[in-house]
Amino acid sequence: MQSKISRLLTNASELCEDRKYAKALKYYDKVLQIEPDNLKANVDKGVTLQNLGCISKAIQMYEKALILEPENLDALINMGSALHTLEKYTEAISCYNIALKLDKKNSMALVYKGLSVGETGNISKAIKYFKKALSIDCNYDLAQISLESAKNIINSK
């Protein structure tokens, strides 16, 4: 049974790489019919739904994943990203804070937190998060682009 689940997850992942999200959902649903508590399927289905713009449904998948494993970094960071998309910046920041308590050097959580903090109007604090992320991963494009954008915002005032 595990090999079947593994094949289904691989197929879904490959479809996502090809941006065939609706088809990928069918594979995640098959996995979840067999094994409703499959953490990877719950998180990855959430990501796929988020890519399709189904943010509320994505959040439901992340919530289920976090019930299964409350300290799952992927679920926490993706939940924060989905909440950010809904402009729920404070809630998004809470997700990133939990992720950063678990892994204080998680550059993605730092950048995403910086983006949400920036949206609340605190650009100088956002810059600190972008710089911290770059101190961990100097090649992180999103951190570099976000830092430059934030500096441009401050310089234009």
What residues fall within each predicted segment?
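Alpha-helical segment of the N-proximal tetratricopeptide repeat
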Residues: 3-40, 47-51
